[in-house]
Every structure is written in C-alpha cells, then in structure tokens.
C-alpha cells in the first residue's frame, strides 16, 4: 500500500546476504535483496518505480545513498546495508556519480576486455579481483550499481556508456544471481549464491563460497 500510494517511508536493512550468521544460520537474508528489487521494477499509478532501492558499496557511497533516500519524497526507499567491515573503494572515486544508480569506479579511460559489476560489499571484492586480472594484462572496468532502478531511469546514452551492449560483463552478488542478470546482458555471467547460508565467520564463508579476488579472476577467465 505504501508503494502504491507514493507514501514516503524509509526501510533500512542492515544485515544483507550470508555474512551475518556466525552465531547460527537464522538470519541470513540471501533471498531478500531479490524480493526487494522486484518492487523497484513495479510501477505505481503515476508511472514511477514503486520503490527506490539502494545497496551502497562502502561508507562514502552510503552517504550519497542516504541523501538520495532523504530527498526522495515520491516513493518509499529501501537501503540494504552490510554489517561486516568493508574496504573503501579506490582513492579518487567520484562518489557523487552514485546518484545515477550505476557508475564507473575504475577503468573509465580504457576499452575494457571485461566489465565487472556489483553492488554493496561485493564491489570491493571486484576491486581486488581486478588487480589480479590487470596483472595478467587485461583491461578491466569496475562498475558499482547501488540502484538498478535509478540507472535505468538515466538516458540511454549514459546506460550505454557505463554498460555497453555486447560487452563482456561479469556480475558478482552475494544474493541470488537474478539480482544482476538484467545488467550483464547476453554475453555476461553472474556469480551468486543459490542456497541459504551457513554458520561461520564471514571471512571463512567468503572463502568457502567463492567470494574472493581469486575466484573473480577464475570466473572471468572461464567466461572469456
């Protein structure tokens, strides 16, 4: 009802993905990002996305997303946040571009061999994986996409600039792969989680479930 009636409300979800189950697998919302993002694709009676969904990559991007949510008076907003420590994005990152829903974190001046895209804490994993790929001679672009809904509201030329049609795009998500399938395109691939999580420290889970720089490297090499 809130989404249909354009009522302003903010929902903050502070335990995303599978990394919060160290004291038992009782609250790992692997599936919930996909459920929330479905509401972003549903229009209200005024033709707007019925919900603004934002999953920021680090503390600075969270500041931008918080401002977007506070300024959104037309629809409810949902912020999907992480509880574990997250590496900051590379120095010099233009965080203001997050207001467009998706933007280039690194590799903007090159014709990339592959584009890496994620939201939330997975972006920092892509940064680490990109370092391995670049050491292997590859040209890599990294895209942070806190809000697909905002990104799809940008002009087609901007969308093409960030994620060109026909590009090789690899997506990493700690939720269901469907979270990024609309971004990677026909030539892309998504590595995600298709089951509920486990009870263990988050760094152990990252390693066991493949959310590491090395697996980003392996997955991209396999895709190409």
Which residue stretches match the model-derived regions?
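TRNA-recognition modules of translation machinery and tRNA-sensing kinases, especially anticodon-binding
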Residues: 57
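Single conserved hydrophobic/aromatic residue that forms the stacking wall/gate
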Residues: 1-12
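Thiamine diphosphate
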Residues: 17-38, 42-52, 62, 70-224
């Amino acid at each position: 009802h809130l989404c249909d009636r354009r009522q302003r409300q903010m929902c903050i979800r502070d335990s995303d993905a599978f990394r919060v189950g160290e004291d038992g697998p009782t609250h790992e919302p692997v599936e919930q990002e996909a459920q929330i993002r479905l509401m972003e694709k549903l229009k209200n009676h005024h033709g707007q996305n019925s919900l603004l969904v934002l999953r920021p990559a680090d503390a600075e991007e969270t500041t931008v997303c918080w401002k977007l949510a506070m300024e959104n008076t037309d629809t409810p907003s949902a912020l999907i946040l992480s509880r574990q420590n997250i590496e900051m994005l590379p120095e010099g990152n233009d965080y203001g571009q997050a207001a467009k829903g998706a933007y280039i974190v690194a590799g903007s001046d090159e014709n990339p061999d592959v584009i890496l895209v994620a939201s939330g804490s997975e972006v920092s994993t892509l940064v680490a994986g990109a370092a391995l790929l670049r050491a292997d001679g590859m040209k890599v672009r990294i895209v942070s996409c806190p809000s697909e809904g905002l990104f799809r509201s940008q002009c087609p030329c901007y969308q093409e600039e960030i994620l060109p049609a026909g590009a090789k795009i690899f997506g990493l998500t700690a939720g269901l792969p469907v979270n990024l399938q609309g971004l990677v395109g026909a030539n892309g691939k998504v590595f995600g989680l298709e089951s509920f999580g486990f009870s263990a420290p988050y760094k152990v889970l990252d390693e066991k479930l493949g959310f590491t720089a090395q697996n980003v490297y392996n997955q991209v090499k396999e895709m190409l």
